[in-house]
């Protein structure tokens, strides 16, 4: 069985790239390449991850500068060719800034940085990202963000709801004020996913809280199968 090949983009200010690599390479045994933001070669990769952190210091707003990095053009092409793209926290913010996912991530409703473990409900179980979870399962995953409140206009929200693009919701309620309790969404194809919670921070078998492990197992099993 062929191994799923991961690429993890590293921006100045990224701080979760090694955490993701520990899971993909160390836990799952998948070939994993760290990709500097100035690189443009994404050939041979199945899944490209935009990790959490504070890309370019999050100056202007989260993800606003990272969208112009040389790697982002190649990332869009990777997605258009049918490749898989995952944005976690700051990565989700970058995907919305780049127009690869709709809506925006703005300041939390309480105007404070939130670092906590929260309930996350799985709304779609039929995606490669979530196939190892039962639909409707409630997970406990870490969040850590100051600009994590998902917003969009009414028409976009209706489209997300009607097309089944809401993959994760906060449960019972969004701590950051996200519209419709949205914690993660995908594009219409289901291949591009952005979420604010950190599944890589809940994937160490030696630490309490392992609800993130099935997330990573899902994409590996789906693509390898």
From Swiss-Prot:
The active site is at 89 (nucleophile), 198, 200. The keyword Transmembrane does not apply. It is found in: Cytoplasm. It comes from the Bacteria. One of its GO terms (cellular component) is cytoplasm. Residues 5-225 form the Glutamine amidotransferase type-1 domain. This is Phosphoribosylformylglycinamidine synthase subunit PurQ. It comes from Synechococcus sp. (strain JA-3-3Ab).
